């Protein structure tokens, strides 16, 4: 979903505040602070990638595009979390791996045993019997 007018206005306002020289650019080293001021979490790896791609500064158009993409990712992440919460009966943030495998085989689009096994390995790489679905969602969204 595209950014709302309110979100777009907030992004532009934040850009202007951080454009100290008023040259239409902000240092890529400040992008993390700008995003956090907008309530958007970003990893150091994402910031490093952005800096490698753009160099020392980012213009408003690229900034707006980056933030809009980040907002879409965040919305998708929240949708996944909501879906997992349905199966988190005790609100612990964890789901039993065996139950997860059963859900994957029986609900929605039926997955093959091999597909389910791959998903389970990704969800519970240490084979502990349960997994933190917040962490799982962040890992799959990062791919």
Swiss-Prot record:
It is found in: Cytoplasm; Prospore membrane. Induction: Five-fold increase in meiosis in mei4-dependent manner. Disruption phenotype: Cells are viable and complete sporulation normally at 28 degrees Celsius, but form four-spored asci poorly at 34 degrees Celsius. In sporulation-defective cells, the forespore membrane (FSM) is formed abnormally and F-actin localization is aberrant. Only fragmented or anucleated FSMs are formed and F-actin dots remain at peripheral regions of mother cells even during meiosis II. Sporulation defect is alleviated by overexpressing myo1 from which IQ domain is deleted. GO terms for cellular component: cell cortex; cell cortex of cell tip; cell tip; cortical cytoskeleton; cytoplasm; cytosol; mating projection actin fusion focus; mating projection tip. SMART domains: EFh. Coiled coil: none annotated. InterPro entries: CALM/Myosin/TropC-like, EF-hand-dom_pair, EF_hand_dom. It comes from the Eukaryota. Interacts with myo1 and pik1. Belongs to the calmodulin family. This is Myosin 1 light chain cam2. It comes from Schizosaccharomyces pombe (strain 972 / ATCC 24843) (Fission yeast). The gene is cam2.
């Amino acid at each position: 979903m595209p950014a709302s007018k309110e979100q777009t206005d907030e992004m532009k306002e934040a850009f202007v505040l951080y454009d100290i020289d008023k040259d239409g650019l902000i240092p890529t080293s400040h992008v993390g602070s700008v995003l956090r001021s907008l309530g958007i979490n970003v990893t150091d790896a994402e910031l490093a990638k952005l800096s490698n791609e753009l160099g020392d500064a980012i213009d408003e158009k690229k900034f707006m595009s980056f933030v809009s993409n980040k907002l879409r990712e965040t919305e998708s992440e929240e949708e996944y979390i909501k879906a997992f919460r349905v199966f988190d009966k005790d609100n612990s943030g964890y789901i039993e791996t065996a139950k997860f495998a059963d859900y994957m085989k029986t609900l929605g689009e039926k997955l093959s045993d091999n597909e389910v096994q791959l998903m389970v390995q990704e969800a519970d790489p240490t084979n502990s019997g349960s997994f933190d679905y917040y962490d799982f969602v962040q890992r799959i969204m990062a791919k």
